[in-house]
Amino acid sequence: MSNETLSFNTVAVTGALGGIGKEVIRTLHQLGAHVIAIDLLDSQEGNRIFKEFVPNNGEYICSDLTQESSEASLQAILAKSNYPDAVVSLAGIVVSGNLVDQSNSDIDRVLSTNLNSQMKLTREVIKHWIANKTKGQMIYVSSWVDHVPWPGISPYAASKAGLHAFARGVARENARYGIRANVISPGIVDVGMAAKQWREEPDYRARASRAIPLGRLQTPQEVADGIAFLLSKNAEYMTGSNLLIDGGASLYPMDPEEVL
């Protein structure tokens, strides 16, 4: 676990109950933050899981940010969370398949979840921070595929590249208020489908191993530690930056054997 000293008292995390999110909220709780977890699970189930990782000094909010399109509804969510002074934007989805096989709905869902909803949430958070002179920080979770394309996830890669560009714009526009925005770009993390394929599909494991110079999947804790660093006093001079922690996966393009 990270031993950073955090610069923020209250941190909201979207996508908080996913494989990476659970390690993030646990780590931030252990570092003394009041943690606000936002996710899709209903309140009863979400609270049960949340308490396993944050037994006290935190709260769970059930919300689908892709459906909270109005300014009023987003402000209501933020009011429930007592307006955090830092937000970790972890919510995201991937739809796998070549672009020609993806429907309009697939593409729209990826862009809505990974990019559009993050923009709208950021807008409402920053309005509050400016009005209350809060020197907050937005942290966006992008991906190494922002830098090196991975076959079969073009809309996902575009959404993550867009999130990176958006973060830089937010950083530039709001630095005068003491508001910062940074990005963390993990590699192939040992959760979800990647973890399943790594363990069960020899071809995928061989292909992924060739793509990762360090030769292993990234642990969720390694992502959480990177986020803790960005929230720490050691990173207070960083804004508009991208913390790329990918085991070297972005160092070189794929060879032909790595194409699906």
Regions found by a protein language model. Give the residues of each.
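Short C-terminal tail/terminal secondary-structure segment
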Residues: 228, 239-260
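Conserved glycine-rich cofactor-binding loop
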Residues: 17-18
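Active-site loop-to-helix junction immediately N-terminal to the catalytic Tyr of the SDR YXXXK motif
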Residues: 102, 149-157, 169, 197, ...
